[in-house]
Amino acid sequence: MDITLANFQLKAIADLTAAMKKPNRDIILKSCTGSGKTIILTHFMDEYFKSNHKKVFIWLTPGKGNLEEQSKEKMDRYIHGSQTKLLSDIMTSGFEENDACFINWEKLTKKGNNALKDSERTNFIEHIRNALDDGLTFKIIVDESHQNDTIKADDIIELFHSDKIIRCSATPKNYKNAILIDIPEEDVIAEGLIKKLLIINENFEQHISVDDQITYLLDKAIVKQRELHSEYLNRKADINPLIIVQIPNKSDALLDRVEEYFESKGIT
């Protein structure tokens, strides 16, 4: 998939590449939602592999939602011939040069998961040791780093003996002696990736009582989406506006309700 990178994305890749040559272990990539963080990082890894040998990237993701699978799929799509792996692939074949490995760190610490326990097959820690013995070195990317700042996550990171950790977040915490790469939101807006204007609850009735707030808001969203779609068609533009529903962390019940709503409308 050919992608034309925005100027700020190209600069971020150049800044990451330069930061990897400096002695600082921690690199903070601060990027707002909509800046194309995954595009930046996957292209950065691809460029880094081309000029650095015997390297493996470990991309750690938090929690539920299969973020590691989504990120892997994006790299497969963005970077032709990329060498990506999930945890299951690592447990089968270990680490190899130029691997980009996408791992949900909580799966390694979850009770009942034997990935970090002795077993008949070579376990996860032994795969790391074998890679290090073979002369491979690991570079770490911590996605949504503000959610990964836990003792258990740090324990996983330390297993790789990495001299470089890239921590990505829209709201990063402070790290001593870290290199900060900050993508200005105005640069993202200028490139048209996100909008400068946000209209909240346009033409909503005021001071009304509703039986089901979730259904009410989603109904409104669908009506607005159809209005916009119709207007685009009138202008002979084949654009189908997207409805984005932001759900708080650990709100599985709310997520289920939203999914059931869209299924009832034939939207899946």
Per-range role (PLM):
Residues I90-C101:
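Conserved motor-coupling elements within RecA-like helicase/translocase cores
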Residues A100-I156:
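Conserved RecA-like ASCE ATPase "motif II neighborhood" in helicase/translocase motors
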Residues T38-H43, F49, H53-I79, E106, ...:
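Conserved Walker A/P-loop ATP-binding site and its immediately adjacent core
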Residues P23-H43:
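Walker A/P-loop
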Residues M1-K30:
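Conserved pre-motif I regulatory segment
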Residues I179-G266:
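Conserved interdomain linker/interface between the two RecA-like ATPase lobes of SF2 helicase motors
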Residues Q147-L197:
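Post-DEXD/H (motif II) to motif III coupling segment of the RecA-like Helicase ATP-binding lobe
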Residues K22-I28, K55-V56, I239-I243:
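Pre-Walker A (Motif I) flank of P-loop NTPase domains
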